[in-house]
């Protein structure tokens, strides 16, 4: 029997504790879970991709079946096929997230009908945490330690030094 392989994607700019919770939960559903950091052309970059990847790898190092990958110019479905993933994992905080994700699910299914999408609902303590909210707090010099993993906080501090 073949391994169950999933792909959880996002821009993770920056990764939040909500993302980490989703990754931890999704890792229990699969033999192998890839976490794909994708460039989002609709969002202005905050942290360079290398910093995001390094911080995310440190944040998930306790999960033996999780591997972090990145992509600049590929469709999620194509990356899933290349990695052997048969399931895309998406996180939902609210109805707006579902509506946003449903359109991608439609196209993904049209491009590859053998790749399914599953949705994990945010835990109540993470419902209102978002990367854009964290970026806004940082813009005004606020402490974000309770919203992001320590490794991400380190990457942000290191990036500010440069």
UniProtKB/Swiss-Prot annotation:
Function: Reversibly transfers an adenylyl group from ATP to 4'-phosphopantetheine, yielding dephospho-CoA (dPCoA) and pyrophosphate.
Keyword line: ATP-binding, Coenzyme A biosynthesis, Cytoplasm, Magnesium, Nucleotide-binding, Nucleotidyltransferase, Transferase
Listed InterPro entries: Cyt_trans-like, PPAT, Rossmann-like_a/b/a_fold
Stored NCBIfam families: coaD_prev_kdtB (TIGR01510), cyt_tran_rel (TIGR00125)
Taxonomy, superkingdom: Bacteria
Pathway linked to the protein: Cofactor biosynthesis; coenzyme A biosynthesis; CoA from (R)-pantothenate: step 4/5
GO molecular function: ATP binding; pantetheine-phosphate adenylyltransferase activity
GO annotation terms (biological process): coenzyme A biosynthetic process
UniProt EC number: 2.7.7.3
Pfam family membership, one: CTP_transf_like
Protein known as: Phosphopantetheine adenylyltransferase
Record-stated family: Belongs to the bacterial CoaD family.
Residues bound to ATP: 11-12, 19, 91-93, 101, 126-132
Top-level EC class: transferase
Major localisation: cytoplasm
Residue stretches spanning the membrane: none
CDD domains found in the cross-reference section: PPAT (cd02163)
Cofactor: Mg(2+)
Site (described: Transition state stabilizer): 19
Subunit and interaction comment: Homohexamer.
Location relative to the cell: Cytoplasm
Catalytic reaction list: (R)-4'-phosphopantetheine + ATP + H(+) = 3'-dephospho-CoA + diphosphate
